[in-house]
């Protein structure tokens, strides 16, 4: 969606975005760097999903205003000044999640939202009207189908993905790109002899040469601006049990404009270093952090934190667990199903041990999605163990996946 407010009423920020990754916003909330964030409107569950949960809580407490838009109350709701109940897809009409095979799927509205629940679009339009944009954010756009046709598909890839076309088939989906309502769907892109959408005739790929470009001077310049090369160089996160190269910020910590961010945003220059006697991982190992923590999506019944409000999923998988190899558990005096303590250099949590022979002896796995405000089986988020400062220098994404840890038996 492209902003279409009158030109004389569009504010152009004097400073770049506080950061691509929400972890960077914590600095803006707490220290006004690069500028202050005093009010925050959010959905989902940052108080489960963001790294370094102890700091996230302090940052949210420092805000003057926190508004939470969500289907179910969760731990973020508990910190909010205002909670706005949201409507589901079948209560408003919406596009479903993007599919890996480029299918755009429309979900029809079939029932009215319960109680005071409102569609996200309704909330933002009403807020915009109160800021004086009622001539742009018109009431007609509360109809999500009309908003989709008039505002959301104004580009060549999506132009033919209209409500008329979506509803011309019982399954309500179209595989993009489709340049108009009658354009045939393309099952496989970039086949030999085809022309990429928007490219000169005969250009199989949407590049200057029409070929796959693994390196170019323009790419190299972007990577070098951050201290890297466009040619692949292996590095990983710094907390690894084995010695591997990792990226560190340059000593002066100079902020530079990211050449990869779509919206202007600052990042820092970095360099790849080889492990040595002073590397962080060796220091952690010397302190007894002798296992590798891996995080990720939980077992089949759950998806993030959404399903923790369904009693059927709770019956199948109620508790936060830590998978650990039976031999390692025996050495630590840990029994299957008993509570244990998992600790990293950034925090500690408790979880229920799941002895599993399919995991490495030196590795444990803890899923995401739990929080202390869930109605049936509250547990702490695994992100009490993660660190918001460990971010990839190119994407600015935080490391949520791998940390060195130690596990100990916990008395019942």
What are these language model-derived features?
Residues 1-79, 88-95, 169, 174-332:
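Extended redox/cofactor-interaction regions of prokaryotic respiratory oxidoreductases
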Residues 105-107, 201, 208, 287, ...:
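Short strand-coil-strand connectors
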Residues 86-87, 357:
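Electropositive
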Residues 35, 78-79, 97-101, 105-106, ...:
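Short, solvent-exposed loop/turn segments at the edges of secondary structure
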């Amino acid at each position: 969606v492209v902003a279409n407010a009158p030109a004389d009423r569009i504010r152009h920020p004097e400073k770049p975005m506080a950061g691509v990754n929400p972890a960077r916003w914590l600095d803006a909330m707490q220290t006004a760097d690069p500028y202050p964030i005093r009010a925050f409107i959010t959905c989902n569950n940052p108080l489960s999903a963001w790294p370094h949960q102890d700091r996230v809580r302090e940052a949210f407490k420092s805000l003057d205003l926190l508004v939470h838009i969500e289907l179910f109350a969760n731990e973020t709701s508990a910190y909010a000044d205002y909670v706005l109940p949201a409507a589901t897809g079948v209560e408003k009409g919406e596009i479903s999640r993007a599919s890996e095979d480029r299918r755009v799927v429309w979900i029809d509205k079939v029932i009215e939202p319960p109680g005071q629940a409102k569609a996200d679009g309704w909330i933002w339009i009403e807020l915009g009207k109160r800021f004086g944009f009622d001539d742009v954010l018109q009431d007609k756009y509360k109809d999500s189908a009309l908003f989709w046709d008039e505002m959301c598909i104004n580009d060549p890839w999506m132009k033919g993905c209209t409500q008329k076309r979506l509803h011309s088939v019982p399954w309500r989906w179209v595989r993009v790109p489709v340049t108009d309502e009658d354009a045939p769907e393309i099952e496989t892109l970039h086949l030999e002899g085809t022309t990429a959408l928007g490219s000169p005739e005969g250009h199989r790929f949407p590049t200057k040469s029409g070929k796959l470009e693994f390196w170019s001077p323009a790419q190299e310049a972007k990577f070098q601006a951050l201290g890297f090369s466009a040619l692949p160089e292996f590095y990983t996160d710094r907390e690894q049990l084995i010695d591997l190269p990792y990226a560190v910020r340059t000593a002066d910590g100079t902020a530079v404009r990211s050449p990869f961010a779509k919206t202007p945003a600052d990042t820092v220059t970095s360099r790849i270093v080889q492990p040595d006697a002073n590397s962080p991982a060796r220091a952690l190992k010397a302190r007894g952090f002798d296992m590798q923590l891996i995080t990720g999506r939980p077992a089949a019944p759950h998806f993030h934190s959404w399903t923790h409000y369904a009693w059927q999923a709770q019956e199948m998988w109620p508790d936060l667990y830590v998978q650990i190899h039976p031999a390692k558990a025996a050495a630590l005096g840990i029994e299957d199903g008993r509570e244990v303590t998992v600790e990293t250099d950034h925090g500690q949590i408790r979880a229920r041990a799941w002895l599993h022979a399919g995991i490495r002896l030196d590795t444990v796995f803890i899923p995401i999605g739990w929080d202390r405000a869930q109605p049936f089986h509250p547990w702490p988020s695994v992100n009490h163990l993660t660190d918001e400062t460990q971010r990839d220098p190119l994407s600015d994404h935080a490391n949520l996946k791998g940390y060195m840890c130690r596990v100990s038996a916990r008395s019942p």
